[in-house]
Amino acid sequence: MDTVHEGHHGSDSSSSGDTVNVEVTNYEKTQLGQAPLPLAPAPTPAVPVNEKKHKSQKEKKHKGQNEKQDKDSDDEGEDPFAHLPDHEKAVLKRQLDIPTVKVTYFMLFRYATLNDKLLMVLSALSSIIGGALLPLMTIVFGGLTTTFKDFFRQTITQEHFNHELSRFSLYFLYLAIGEFVFVYIATAGFLYTGEHVAGKIRENFLKAILRQNIAFFDQLGAGEITTRITSDTNLVQDGISEKVGLTLTALATFITAFVVSFIKDWKLTLILMSTVFAIVFTMGGMSGFIVKFNKASLASYAEGGTVAEEVISSVRNAKAFNTEAKLTRAYDAHLAVAEKWGFKMKAVTGSMIGFLMCYVYLNYSLAFWMGSRYLVSGRIEVGDVLTIILSIMIGAFALGNVAPNIQAFTTSVAAAAKIFATIDRVSPLDPSSESGETLKSVEGHIELRNIRHIYPSRPEVTVMEDVSLIVPAGKTTALVGESGSGKSTIVGLVERFYDPVGGTVYLDGQDISSLNLRWLRRQISLVSQEPTLFATTIFGNIRHGLIGTAYESESEEKIRELVENAARFANAHDFITGLPEGYATNVGERGFLLSGGQKQRIAIARAMVSDPKILLLDEATSALDTKSEGVVQAALDKAALGRTTIVIAHRLSTIKGADNIVVMSRGRIVEQGTHDALLEKQGAYYNLVEAQRIAAENENKDQEEVAILDEKDQNLKHETTKGEQPEDGLKLARTQTGKSQSSIVLADKKAEVENRYSLWTLIKVVAVFNRQEWLYMTIGIICSVITGGGNPTQAVFFAKAVTALSGDNSTPQGKATIRSQANFWSWMYFMLALVQFSAFLIQGYVFAVCSERLVHRAREQAFKTMLRQDIAFFDKEENTAGALTSFLSTETTHLAGMSGVTLGTILSVIVTLVAAFSVSLAIQWKLSLVCISTVPILLACGFLRFWMLARFQATAKKAYEKSASYACEATSAIRTVASLTREDDVHLHYHDQLVDQERKSLISILRSSSLYAASQSLIFCCTALGFWYGGTLIAKKEIGQFQFFLCFSAVIFGAQSAGTIFSFAPDMGKAKQAAAELKALFDRKPEIDSWSEDGEQLSSVEGHIEFRDVHFRYPTRPEQPVLRGLNLTVKPGQYVALVGASGCGKSTTIQLLERFYDPLAGGVYIDGKEVSSLNVNNYRSWIALVSQEPTLYQGTVKENILLGADRENVPQEAIEQACRDANIYDFIMSLPDAFDTIVGSKGSMLSGGQKQRIAIARALLRDPKILLLDEATSALDSESEKVVQAALDKAAKGRTTIAVAHRLSTIQRADMIYVFDAGKVVESGTHTELIHLRGRYWELVNLQSLGKAQ
């Protein structure tokens, strides 16, 4: 029977007990001593309360993501908790609520240390001084203009003129030196503090995540957490780094410019201030929209990130069912929504920049118009008008430079809002809290009193109703019952993963909610059904069990001794020492490099190493083969002596010796007692035992069993040595093969990323993604040319207007001429403003389309290409689910740095420079050449900074990817982290990685800042040179005022706008790095290519399978042989079982059949054709796989089942039939939303048994010719197993079936059983034949005997 919420068994991120069943077959009802009922859910509390309410909720609930479940329902006026009493509602909501945090920009600096603040103050002051230096230039400029005028009127001598010229030129030089020093301090300071503060935010976010209660994770995907910790913290860093300095510099320039203007003439300045108000008003109004749209875009990307994380972490499943295309579509749906919001945001930003530039030109128009009137009236001199106009021009330009940075600030605030909401959330069950009592000594007496429990993320289902249970100290209590009956829920409540809505749990008579949570968890060791190991060594994994215990601070020798003893105890020592690196072997992410049984034994060793007072075993031996199980079970029985043990078992043979066996059903206790007492009762327990009884051949006595156990221990020891030694010769020869195959790809990939691609190649990569937008691109380019032409055009207008104002204003006629000419050029400026406004507006719109579509397509393509790769790619350490998800969210976003706005800006700048140079050369080539000679130096500085940042980016990315992967691993295994109280340990390790990264990047920061500062200060050198040389030419009477001002303003402002290219260097640096990474990914052609059309297409399959002398090693572990000359044959339609010890190659055989890998030697044949010669997709379409850990994705039950279909448009009847065959139909129909029920991230809303049956339904929907069952029933209780096994037996008719099984009762009826040992077949035959042989199989069967305990 089954539940709605509970399975949580999937990944650790969502694995916890069983929930209440809602589907009960008549057969089960009779078994449990109830009268048969109609299939409609009975109105007991176990059933979803208030059916009608749920029907009405059906439409509204879950608009696509259960994370927002509560919020959505509330928003729509429908509260999912409405049917519950207030106190229960409060308990559940407390476990889910995330307060919304209002984040202001300055809150981003909340983690800045005193040193950071001092450095920021120093950097800010430097930025301000650096910014203030530019307008001071206008005073020098005004002074020089006056000197020119005096020289033309011959009121000063040539010598005096030359002296003044040299003096003013020197002032420029001093300004240049000052600018270099201050800009350097500002840039380096803000880059450093930005990284440091962002690191602190990352660290505090992870710390906060680790102290949250488990219900918080039930509604948040691991992918969303990864997105926050990588992409969102990068956005925050972007908003608090060098852009702060650039903005302060620009604002200081702006303010100083106006101060200078006011000093010269307050009236004219006040008139020109009107444009400033327009600028401020526009920016204020528009940035509100920018934040709003950006938030929506980020939210959609986060949901997409969760989908990607789910898919990548279960990629074998996606491959087996050829669902890559369907899953890509699901991912793409989120990207499409994000694109829409991203487009709106960028279009608004484009419009804002358009308005700002328009105001700048209108300002000139007004300045010349009013300036000419004041000049004519004798109120001011021409030098003052110029200083005011120049200052305001420089000030306004500076304000224009602020606009692009505003986007970074608003984005960083939006990204920080969700991060800080989590950081500030007070966890109702906080393991880091010091509050709560601790007991002096622990007896281990546990009592559950009147427990009523509901999972917070599934408020409509009551999981446990009025359960009272006493677990005496030092005794073993076993919990049995169907899936979803509430067994694992008890474990979750004892560990205090959740608070019950009613009743109390006591430890030694003390309410556990009054005890310190971390102290409580340290008294308990938990081994769960699907063990989670961390990506470190085997030694490190077992050592995690010592955290928080008295042994933690022992010497290394003592710890090693404890670890090895625990491993011996768990029957793991022998296989560990058999590995090439022994205890130093790295287990890979989630331990994927080990078999299920090996992982489980390490998990048991980890639990036992601290000698806990209370031991919780949630199906601790379900992943073990019979051999290991016998030894480990004996060890666990021994371990249970003298300590309180709660055991959950589906395999009843493992709990015969328990002091009390508790039978649960539908969230209640049905009966309890010892094994014998319950058998005599002939009630529910008796029925469960009957369901599991093995065929009658093995009526062996217990003495024989014990003898075999002892002998088995010996066997194992010398088997390991015996099995490994003679392999040496083979090992050497084969390692070569393994290494060459796996390492060539790696070597290639690295070489490509580092140096293979030229910038041109990378630009082509980006161009391909935007190919369809060529029309938009063309329009954007035309607009960029127009916007670029604005600068040189206004240089001509400027020189003309200045010359007009310098005319003789002593006569009425002269005054009239000045007025009419000034009016004409003012009108020209007005026209320029309108043209520029239109061009910026259109450019903003078209580039927004291009860059959003670029990011969307790049993400989709990258995800597709990842799914195209073979399994060996995902086995590599650097390609963990966390690292790849983080790659998808950050790298593709960076790609935008090579498109849209950035390219538009660069093009504008190039046009500006070319046009400015052309105009000035045409007017006065001598002066122009001198000014132009400085521009290459400016560009060289920019290029160098670009190159430095690209290198900086590459190393930073690697470091953060590693730490992000680490954080993702910890958060997705949160139950394990919580039960081991590893929170501080994880946080400390993460902290060390971040500190290391900061130290490495410091030198890089100092170098790139010096280059940037040089590029900024050279503007003053250009100016000095221009003035000095221009003055010299004027002195020689070679040029007049018009030529001087034209060349000067064209080249100076041209050079200044060339400087803006460099503010885009970080984006370009990131984009170049991202494009190289993506190109490397796109170029990687997998050995087994699911996109390939090559290979023979099969039109029909008989199902004859043959392995001929197959040798195999995993590419990531070439030194470890797995299959060593495997031979086996499966005839069409046969049901074949593979049995044997953990790690002997059974699951590997299934993986080779699915063609996840190709053998190193020998071949796998289907109907006489070698599998590697067939088209891989066509071949897989004939096969269905049901694996040990069922994989479900976020979405509805129906969507998950449909993933099995190899065709579109599957009729509902076919789906329902598949569900009936998998014995899950009644359960689905009893759910509030039936087939439309959301299953949660990784299927977290369902119990293990329910997930497995949905997985079976998915496999049956394919109607496969070959059915592969990799421990398909290991997650099921006896009742479900019996029915599902019957369904599988029925499904196996007419098709070839290969089953890997640890529970031998499930495969007795197999046509052929192959017994594996050390990578080859040692026995084969039917169950009866093998029993008569009295060999290895007979031994395994004995170990699983279920007779009465004697």
From Swiss-Prot:
Residues 446-691, 1105-1343 form the ABC transporter domain. Liamocins have high bioactivity against the pathogenic bacteria Streptococcus spp. and can be potential new specific inhibitors of oral streptococcal biofilms without affecting normal oral microflora. Liamocins are also able to inhibit human cancer cell lines such as breast cancer cell lines T47D and SK-BR3 or the cervical cancer cell line HeLa. CDD domains: ABC_6TM_Pgp_ABCB1_D1_like (cd18577), ABC_6TM_Pgp_ABCB1_D2_like (cd18578), ABC_MTABC3_MDL1_MDL2 (cd03249). It is a multi-pass membrane protein. Glycans are attached at N1127. Pfam families: ABC_membrane, ABC_tran. Disruption phenotype: Partially loses the ability to secrete liamocins and leads swollen cells and accumulation of intracellular lipids. It comes from the Eukaryota. The lineage of its organism: Eukaryota, Fungi, Dikarya, Ascomycota, Pezizomycotina. Belongs to the ABC transporter superfamily. ABCB family. Multidrug resistance exporter (TC 3.A.1.201) subfamily. GO terms for biological process: oligopeptide export from mitochondrion. PANTHER family: ATP-DEPENDENT PERMEASE MDL1, MITOCHONDRIAL, ATP-DEPENDENT TRANSLOCASE ABCB1-LIKE. Residues 1-11, 712-731 have a biased composition (Basic and acidic residues). Residues 1-84, 712-734 are annotated as: Disordered. Its main location: membrane. It comes from Aureobasidium melanogenum (Aureobasidium pullulans var. melanogenum). One of its GO terms (molecular function) is ABC-type oligopeptide transporter activity. The keyword Membrane applies. Residues 22-33 have a biased composition (Polar residues). The chain crosses the membrane at residues 124-144, 170-190, 243-263, 271-291, 350-370, 380-400, 779-799, 830-850, 903-923, 929-949, 1014-1034, 1044-1064. This is ABC-type transporter MDR1. SMART domains: AAA. It is found in: Cell membrane. ABC-type transporter that is involved in the secretion of liamocins, glycolipids (also called heavy oils) composed of a single mannitol or arabitol headgroup linked to either three, four or even six 3,5-dihydroxydecanoic ester tail-groups. One of its GO terms (cellular component) is plasma membrane. Residues 52-63 have a biased composition (Basic residues). Gene3D superfamilies: ABC transporter type 1, transmembrane domain (1.20.1560.10), P-loop containing nucleotide triphosphate hydrolases (3.40.50.300). Residues 121-411, 779-1070 form the ABC transmembrane type-1 domain.
